Amino acid sequence: MFRGVATVSLDSKNRLVVPARYRDALLVNGAGRVVVTADPGQCLLLYPLPEWEPIEKKLTALSDFNPRTRSLKQLLVGYAHDIDMDSAGRVLLPPMLRKFAELDKNVVLVGQGSKVELWNEARWEAQVAQALSFSSDALPSELEGFTL
């Protein structure tokens, strides 16, 4: 289970040092094998391989006849990269994915249960500001009556 927010720096070889609390979960669930892919929100998604496999299976089973479905499948499956976390707990992010998410030195990791989102720091701050600006009138129906 991934939760919490952490800001980390990419090293000189564009490797992401995975925080210990996430690293342990990745080692237990997938032996350090991860899949990193693009997200329509212009961040990256990092999954332990066992969590990604059923998602990929569902995605590849979708029909290509609907253009929106096909585009989403192309994005998520097309950008997916299998990556092995090294013994120091680092993940090498491919240039194509770094460019897609506009990742530079500082990367924000956001735990989301079964996955971790990787954000450009400025884009993450804008995302948080947008979330704080929502009024209760604009809540989706599935959140009505939801309490913390």
Q: Each predicted region: which residue ranges?
A:
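Acidic/histidine-enriched, glycine/proline-rich intrinsically disordered or flexible terminal extensions
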Residues: 131-148
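Short, structured motif recognition centered on aromatic/hydrophobic residues
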Residues: 14-18, 47, 89-93, 97, ...
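A positional/architectural concept
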Residues: 3-44, 49
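Short, low-complexity cationic-aromatic patches
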Residues: 7-17, 82-91, 145
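Short, solvent-exposed interaction modules
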Residues: 60-91, 97-98
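A low-complexity, Ser/Thr/Gly/Pro-enriched, surface-exposed linker/loop concept
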Residues: 42-45, 49-67
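A short beta-strand-loop micro-motif that forms or neighbors metal/cofactor-
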Residues: 28-43, 102-119, 123, 136
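Short active-site loop/helix that positions an aromatic residue
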Residues: 25-27, 96-100
